[in-house]
Amino acid sequence: MLAKILLLLLLCGSGSIVVYAREFNINCNSNLVMYWGQNSRGVTNPGENQLPLDEYCDKESGDVLVLSFLSEFNADGLHPPGLNLANACVTTFTNTTLLHCPNIGKAITHCQKQGKVVLLSMGGAAGAYGFADDTQAER
């Protein structure tokens, strides 16, 4: 086994090994989907917070990133949507509870330029959301 590894390194040459970022391929059945936004990194690495979204696009092998979560929407038709992205948004728009997340838009654009698909997950484990019927959901 060691001989095969050494042969591979010899054939590749030192310094010529390149790691390529993955891109979403709709015809592939091995795309990797990752959730981002609920500080799951802090769960697996206590004391550490999630990295900014664009850093995951630069470093990780994921093809699709799902932003988690749009936790409140259409609850009563009177309130703006509620977004929960853990530590990614720390301010709100003036006189509202609507989060202001200017870096998220830039990060999404950055990720898309790298061939990543970025989606927004509606719902989550808890929250106020739902639709009365299919017609309301389609609007």
Question: Where are the regions that the model predicts?
Answer:
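N-terminal signal peptide
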Residues: 2, 10-27
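Terminal targeting and flexible regions in eukaryotic proteins, enriched
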Residues: 2-12, 35, 66
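Chitinase-like catalytic core of GlcNAc-active glycosidases
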Residues: 20-139
